[in-house]
């Protein structure tokens, strides 16, 4: 039987090879669009399929992280190459990264270059611009924390402390989750957990769902802080171009705001691009109309559902979405219902107040927690809480001893 499996060295270099393929396609330019798609799309699909041959030699969370990035690159290819967004929208670097949280302002350049090697360099630049901060394609609602000219040494000190704080939070939650019947340590239990989370009472599932959300929050924010510090030290970015990954928790009082401003915006560019393409280019809906607004909403969450379902497929090597399609797919109807309830309340004379925000906080916590329960439960049952023990970590050792004490 013919196998599509490549030698292990290519599987290990899967992500760099995928990005090299995308940058090559971008460098060929829109004038050779048909040729570059025919050349690079089969290569992309072939490289993505290598995830099906990747052996699990470590915790399941490592496999999930790698496949999440693989699926992310698929949608980057759609955005850059199939939709030709960089050339169609004339992406450019902004002058001194003068941006606001609601979008970019003043331009420094006038779109991608035309030469092959110049486009390779341009592709490398935008590929390493996380969330495209400081570029004309920057996503909305990114929490801009620093003004232009913010001192680098202050930024490095502040972000280093922030990374340390989230590292401690991450280590604490990892030790706690490993101590539950639904987790463990990879060096002693390199299998799935002993007890399925789906066999515990509903409220326990709800609690563990939020524990997992906070663990993801701490892990991503720690990584984002470290990346910001390294980027600023190496002069690859300015402090203004390295904001926090998450928004202000004070905005966590509607499901819409939870997704649009509080949670990380790493997928915002891809989801909004697909939504705009369907609403304006395919369906020719009027900008700002009711239909356009909700088509973009449903398509955006559809893209997110497809990405996370694809990750589950690559991890399980089977047609299994781990309830990702349900969780992400149901968020759009919830937000649509929420919008109409809020609009009705305003028409009846209700105004924003601390009481309504508290009620909104409770509603949002329950709505996300219960709809996310099946998806998070599937990941935990797959071994998401079976962590790698850091034998040289004094902090982790102290936390383990503290939890094991009667």
UniProtKB/Swiss-Prot annotation:
Keywords: Acyltransferase, Membrane, Transferase, Transmembrane, Transmembrane helix, Virulence
Induction: Expression is co-regulated with the other genes from the sirodesmin cluster and corresponds with sirodesmin production.
Membrane-topology descriptor: Multi-pass membrane protein
Chain's role: Acetyltransferase; part of the gene cluster that mediates the biosynthesis of sirodesmin PL, an epipolythiodioxopiperazine (ETP) characterized by a disulfide bridged cyclic dipeptide and that acts as a phytotoxin which is involved in the blackleg didease of canola. SirD catalyzes the O-prenylation of L-tyrosine (L-Tyr) in the presence of dimethylallyl diphosphate (DMAPP) to yield 4-O-dimethylallyl-L-Tyr, and therefore represents probably the first pathway-specific enzyme in the biosynthesis of sirodesmin PL.
Source organism of the structure: Leptosphaeria maculans (Blackleg fungus)
EC numbers: 2.3.1.-
Any single Gene Ontology cellular-component annotation: membrane
Known pathway: Mycotoxin biosynthesis
InterPro entries in the record: Wax_synthase_dom
An example Gene Ontology molecular-function term: acyltransferase activity
Membrane-crossing segments per the record: 9-29, 32-52, 63-83, 295-315, 323-343, 358-378
Recorded family membership: Belongs to the wax synthase family.
Coiled coil (UniProt feature): none
Compartments where found: Membrane
UniProt protein name: Acetyltransferase sirH
């Amino acid at each position: 039987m013919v196998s599509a499996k490549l030698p292990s060295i290519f599987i290990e270099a899967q992500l760099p090879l995928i990005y090299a393929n995308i940058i090559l396609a971008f460098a060929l330019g829109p004038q050779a669009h048909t040729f570059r798609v025919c050349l690079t799309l089969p290569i992309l699909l072939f490289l993505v399929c290598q995830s099906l041959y990747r052996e699990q030699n470590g915790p399941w969370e490592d496999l999930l992280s790698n496949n999440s990035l693989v699926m992310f690159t698929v949608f980057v290819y759609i955005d850059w190459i199939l939709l030709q967004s960089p050339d169609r929208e004339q992406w450019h670097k902004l002058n001194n990264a003068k941006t606001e949280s609601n979008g970019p302002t003043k331009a420094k350049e006038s779109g991608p270059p035309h030469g092959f090697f110049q486009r390779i360099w341009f592709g490398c630049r935008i590929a390493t611009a996380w969330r495209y901060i400081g570029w004309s394609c920057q996503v909305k609602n990114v929490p801009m924390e620093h003004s232009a000219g913010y001192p680098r040494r202050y930024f490095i000190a502040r972000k280093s402390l922030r990374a340390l704080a989230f590292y401690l939070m991450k280590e604490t939650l990892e030790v706690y989750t490993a101590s539950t019947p639904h987790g463990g340590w990879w060096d002693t239990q390199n299998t799935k957990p002993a007890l399925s989370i789906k066999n515990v009472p509903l409220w326990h599932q709800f609690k563990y769902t939020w524990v997992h959300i906070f663990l993801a929050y701490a892990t991503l924010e720690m990584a984002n802080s470290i990346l910001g510090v390294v980027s600023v030290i190496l002069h690859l970015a300015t402090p203004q171009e390295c904001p926090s990954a998450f928004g202000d928790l004070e905005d966590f009082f509607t499901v819409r705001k939870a997704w649009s401003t509080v949670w990380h915006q790493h997928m915002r560019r891809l989801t909004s691009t697909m939504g705009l393409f369907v609403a304006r280019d395919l369906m020719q809906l009027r900008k700002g109309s009711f239909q356009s607004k909700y088509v973009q909403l449903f398509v955006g969450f559809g893209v997110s559902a497809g990405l996370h379902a694809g990750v589950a497929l690559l991890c399980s090597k089977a047609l299994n979405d781990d309830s990702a399609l349900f969780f992400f797919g149901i968020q759009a109807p919830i937000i649509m219902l929420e919008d109409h309830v809020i609009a009705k309340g305003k028409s009846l004379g209700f105004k924003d107040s601390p009481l309504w925000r508290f009620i909104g906080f409770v509603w949002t916590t329950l709505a996300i927690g219960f709809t996310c329960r099946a998806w998070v439960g599937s990941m935990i049952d797959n071994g998401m809480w079976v962590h790698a023990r850091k034998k040289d970590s004094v902090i982790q050792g102290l936390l383990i001893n503290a939890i094991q004490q009667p």
